[in-house]
């Protein structure tokens, strides 16, 4: 049935535990974050919600989010005074699924969570200690061998800027160009042995961040020196890349518009 009423665009910011899902995008072989969110929107709005939501990035299976952004349209719009009630209802329905909708705001019709993004920040967490992990399983990459973050920072400096990142690109990546500009990479280690790596860019190739982290880890543990790291970057060949870091340590932290 055609609805002869206007449709309003909305943006939501989402936090989720990616370990329970096949990824962000709708898939036939399992539960996706996109699918679970669409279910609760449909449950509230029925026929007034007719189009798939659009995410700022299609996070892979096991990848988490602290600030994923998405947009969708509702025919007839949402009463502004009911947004808080609506958030509470959605989060009640999503609570056991490991998903939380943090905020909702009205956007103009041209806003697109993916295409309108100016900057994305990904956070990668490494727990660098010999002892086993009790609290952060499926939340960090546990690396027992001590990593030299100073040499990792030198590698990160080489990755910063505009490059052909074919080395770090998944074979299934559909991006038209491997050229990307990394605006900033920061690496910090806290007292508990947790290393936090942040990557900032307008966009990334599929598995690019995890592949870069894998190479930086090789550098930090001494398997590679800076020369080998540079050769890998400049080769533009996937075969020269270290094994990608596991999905469990990766978080889509925030998206800027």
Q: How should each PLM-predicted stretch be described?
A:
Residues 2-257:
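Structured-RNA-binding interfaces characteristic of tRNA pseudouridine synthases
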């Amino acid at each position: 049935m055609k609805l002869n009423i206007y449709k309003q665009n909305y943006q939501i910011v989402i936090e989720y535990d990616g370990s329970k899902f096949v990824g962000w995008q709708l898939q036939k072989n399992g539960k996706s974050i996109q699918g679970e969110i669409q279910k609760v929107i449909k449950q509230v709005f029925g026929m007034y919600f007719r189009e798939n939501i659009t995410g700022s990035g299609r996070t892979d299976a096991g990848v988490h989010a602290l600030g994923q952004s998405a947009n969708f349209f509702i025919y007839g719009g949402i009463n502004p005074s009911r947004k808080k009630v609506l958030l509470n209802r959605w989060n009640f329905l999503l609570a056991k699924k490991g998903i939380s909708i943090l905020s909702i705001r009205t956007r103009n019709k041209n806003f697109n969570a993916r295409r309108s993004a100016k900057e994305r920040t990904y956070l990668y967490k490494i727990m660098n200690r010999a002892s086993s992990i009790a609290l952060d399983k499926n939340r960090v990459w546990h690396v027992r061998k001590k990593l030299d973050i100073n040499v990792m920072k030198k590698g990160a400096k080489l990755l910063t800027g505009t490059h052909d990142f074919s080395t770090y690109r998944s074979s299934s990546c559909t991006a038209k160009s491997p050229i990307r500009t990394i605006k900033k990479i920061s690496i910090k280690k806290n007292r508990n042995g947790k290393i936090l790596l942040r990557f900032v860019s307008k966009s990334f190739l599929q598995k690019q961040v995890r592949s870069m982290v894998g190479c930086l880890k090789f550098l930090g543990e001494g398997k590679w020196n800076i020369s080998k790291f540079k050769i890998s970057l400049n080769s533009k060949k996937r075969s020269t890349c270290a094994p990608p870091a596991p999905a469990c340590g990766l978080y889509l932290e925030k998206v800027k518009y």
